[in-house]
Amino acid sequence: SDINSLKQMDVILTCQGGDYTSEVFPKLKAEGWDGYWIDAASTLRMADDAIIVLDPVNLNVIKDGLVNGTKTFVGGNCTVSLMLMGLGSLFQNNLVEWATSMTYKAASGAGAQNMRELITGMGYLYNNTKALLDDPKSAILDIDRQIAELQRGEGFPKANFGVPLAGSLIPYIDKQLESGQSKEEWKGQVETNKILGNQQIVPIDGHCVRIGAMRCHSQAITLKLKKDVALDEIEDMIRQSSQWAKVVPNTREASMTDLTPVAVTGTLTVPVGRLRKLNMGKEYLGAFT
């Protein structure tokens, strides 16, 4: 954070987190620095003079920004970016009237210490019920009762999440807003529309939930399309969304083997499956990614 050294740079690429950005960026600007700031933190995402970078989807917006003098480029929210990596072409082809996203967010989104805490919680439950688990005559209701007592007890590791995650879930992520949304849910609409450079806002809302997966966020998406589009056409558009998008056939076997965090972690694949028209009408599309 040596401002004198940093202001000599033409380009600064930072992955130091929001506190660093909040401290350093204003000081650099106050010193008259006019270089390119490329940032993984969320701090500057919604600034008027910043572009949210998702180049497989919004390269045209990025190029226009460069031509017009934009110098602040920021990475987007995880599930917003993943939704657009998989379904971006439906938005780009102006087919989406509105969307809901119900997210199943992994521990990794909360940070390294939270990932450790999830594993520690799993171990705590196992170690304290091992005697019953090893006894084939033990009743599962007794084990279940003991698990619940352990989760509610003072000894359960929850310093980072605040409540137990292992064997449970957390139906609220980030700050509480006056709208009733969490901040994580608010990001869905504002960031999607900013990434795409939309002049007319596409309404997006949903619920963001933390689950006991280590990595790979998942989301169940409902899209209200502006017209009836055949599923095979939709699948072709998804394949064109990015080179990493993969259509998973809507079968039980394919969904269970190819559409899970276990299948995807460690890869760059963005699988999109459970694609089907919903009972509400032919313009309603369900997806899981």
Model regions and ranges:
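N-terminal Rossmann-like NAD(P) cofactor-binding subdomain of oxidoreductases
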Residues: S1-N160, I201-P203, K227, D236, ...
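Contiguous C-terminal substrate-recognition/catalytic subdomains in enzyme active sites
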Residues: K130-V262
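Coil-to-beta-strand transition motifs
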Residues: C216, K282-E283
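Short, well-ordered beta-strand elements
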Residues: L285-T289
